[in-house]
Structure formats: structure tokens, C-alpha cells
């Protein structure tokens, strides 16, 4: 009987210690050849950066984080030897990323000597992501090594290095582009969409999104992406421009709709945008040249 009680006791202890709260993600990190005694992880929540420093003991550390479901979490390499010093600044090393999945254990293993190659386990979304990162990680490693050579010396022939780095970037983007249609029910595909946006015609980008499953499109990020697409469609060539009104320096109200039938150049800028403000003298030159020809300027 005593043996049975002891056996049951350890079963209960194992169950308690293995539990992960349904509103947190447990992150377990295993490292090799990493010289620091902590590793930093960061993520975004509510528009703010959040972070934790995970203490390492014998190459292993763990922490529970309250990151929103499917938030991208990044492991930052704070080892100064991994950074690139360039001029008066630094170029930080690439991060290792994974997704927060509530109630799950996410295990990340990496060797600093092969950074940012990593093994990521735990949760369906990270399983999907690892299928991509398993191929992309070695390319990111190669690109980083080339960048270290590119910025380390003025004596190297930089053009071949730049071309090889550019080719790797294109290969990585192609991997992401091919992953999306093959995995329409994966949150990873939704996360990858912004990265391929600039290289695709808008119609193709929109179709990639619409081909995702309803479950993925109805997530918080999916709804946000849908809203961004709807706003972009309003400003495509050939669409009726959204009306707005502004007060000019003489106190007169100017409405875009009042200028129907005219050629109108609209310049949007912010007081914080130094390059925008530097362009104003050129804008004045354009105004002096084209305003007499019927072009209306709104700045």
C-alpha cells in the first residue's frame, strides 16, 4: 500500500509541474556555446514592446509569458561578438522567431556557432513555421555570414557579396511566397503576407489572402489585414479618391470634391518627416512651373 501511495504521489506531482496555464505560453530554451547567462525574448502586445530575460543554467532556461495568442516572439542575441559594427552604429544579428500558443510548451534549441539556425517544437503553428524555418534558417545563416564579411573590411570586393546577399533574400522570399498557397489554414501564411506584399501586384496579394481559410481570415490579424486591403482598394488607380477638406493659409476651406475635373497634386507629409520637409523647396518649384498650366497643389 505504501508503494502505491508513493507512486500516486509522484504522478500527481508530475501532473502539477507539467501543467501550463491556458492563458500563458511556456518557453523552454536550450543553448550551446552561448557565452551569456541570460537570453532575451521580446514581443508586441497592445502596441507596446514586452520582454523577458530568461536566466540560463547549464545551457537551459524557461519562462511563462502572457503574450497574445499567435504573437510572434523573437529571441534576441545580445552577444556583442554576433553584432556587426559599421561606422558609428551597429547592425544587430537576425533573431530567432516563434509563435506564442496559449497552453503550449514551446521548445527552442540553438547553437550560437550556427545562429540563427534553430529547432522549434510545440504547438501546431510552430510546427508549421518549423517546416519553413528548417529550410530558411540555413539561408539566413549564410546571408548573415556574408554581411559580416561585407561590412568588416574595405579590402574585399563588395559587389559579388552584395549580389549573393540579394540572391539569398530573393530565395527566402520565394520560399515564403510558395508556402502561403500550400498552407491556407495556417496562421503562419497570414503572418507571411506582409513580407511578400511589395513584390506582388495588389490583385495577386488580395487573392492570396482570400484563398486563406475562413478560420485564419477571422483571426484578429486576419480582420486587420482585410481592413487594410479594403482601404488600399479605395486608393488604386482609377478609383474615386476619398473626399476631404482642409483650411488653407488664408482661412479658406478647400474640398477635394470642389476640384473635380482638375489635375491635383496632393502631398501628404508630417512635421516629424525631415526628408519630406527637405523636399518642399522642390515642391515650390513645381508649383511655380505647373500651376499656371492648371495643376492644383494641395500640401
Where are the regions that the model predicts?
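Bacterial Sec-dependent N-terminal signal peptides
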Residues: 1-30
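A non-transmembrane, solvent-exposed segment enriched in polar/low-complexity residues
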Residues: 19-167, 171
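N-terminal targeting signals for export/organelle localization
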Residues: 91-93, 167-237
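Active-site acidic short loop of glycosyltransferases
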Residues: 185-186, 260-262, 292
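N-terminal "domain-start" segment that seeds a small globular fold
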Residues: 224-256
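Conserved hydrophobic/aromatic "anchor" residues
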Residues: 244, 254, 259, 268-269, ...
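Conserved redox-active cysteine motifs that mediate thiol-disulfide chemistry
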Residues: 260-285
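Structural microenvironment flanking redox-active thiols in thiol-disulfide oxidoreductases
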Residues: 277-299
Amino acid at each position: 500500500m505504501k508503494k502505491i501511495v508513493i507512486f500516486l504521489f509522484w504522478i500527481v506531482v508530475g501532473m502539477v509541474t507539467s501543467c501550463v496555464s491556458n492563458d500563458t505560453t511556456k518557453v523552454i530554451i536550450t543553448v550551446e556555446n552561448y557565452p551569456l547567462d541570460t537570453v532575451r525574448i521580446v514581443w508586441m502586445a497592445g502596441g507596446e514592446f514586452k520582454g523577458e530575460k530568461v536566466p540560463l543554467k547549464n545551457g537551459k532556461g524557461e519562462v511563462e509569458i502572457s503574450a497574445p495568442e499567435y504573437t510572434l516572439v523573437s529571441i534576441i542575441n545580445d552577444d556583442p561578438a554576433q553584432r556587426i559594427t559599421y561606422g558609428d552604429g551597429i547592425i544587430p544579428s537576425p533573431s530567432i522567431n516563434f509563435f506564442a500558443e496559449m497552453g503550449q510548451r514551446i521548445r527552442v534549441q540553438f547553437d550560437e556557432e550556427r545562429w540563427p539556425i534553430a529547432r522549434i517544437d510545440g504547438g501546431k503553428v510552430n510546427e508549421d513555421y518549423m517546416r519553413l524555418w528548417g529550410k530558411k534558417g540555413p539561408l539566413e545563416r549564410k546571408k548573415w555570414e556574408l554581411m559580416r564579411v561585407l561590412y568588416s573590411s574595405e579590402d574585399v570586393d563588395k559587389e559579388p557579396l552584395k549580389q549573393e546577399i540579394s540572391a539569398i533574400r530573393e530565395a527566402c522570399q520565394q520560399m515564403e511566397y510558395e508556402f502561403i498557397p500550400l498552407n491556407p489554414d495556417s496562421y503562419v501564411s497570414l503572418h507571411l503576407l506582409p513580407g511578400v506584399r511589395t513584390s506582388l501586384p495588389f490583385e495577386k496579394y488580395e487573392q492570396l489572402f482570400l484563398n486563406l481559410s475562413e478560420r485564419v481570415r477571422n483571426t484578429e490579424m486576419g480582420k486587420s489585414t482585410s481592413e487594410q486591403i479594403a482601404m488600399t482598394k479605395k486608393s488604386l488607380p482609377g478609383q474615386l479618391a476619398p473626399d476631404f477638406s482642409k483650411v488653407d493659409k488664408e482661412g479658406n476651406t478647400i474640398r477635394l470634391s470642389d476640384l473635380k475635373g482638375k489635375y491635383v497634386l496632393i502631398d501628404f507629409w508630417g512635421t516629424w518627416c525631415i526628408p519630406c520637409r527637405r523636399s518642399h523647396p522642390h515642391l515650390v518649384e513645381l508649383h511655380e512651373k505647373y500651376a499656371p498650366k492648371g495643376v492644383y497643389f494641395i500640401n
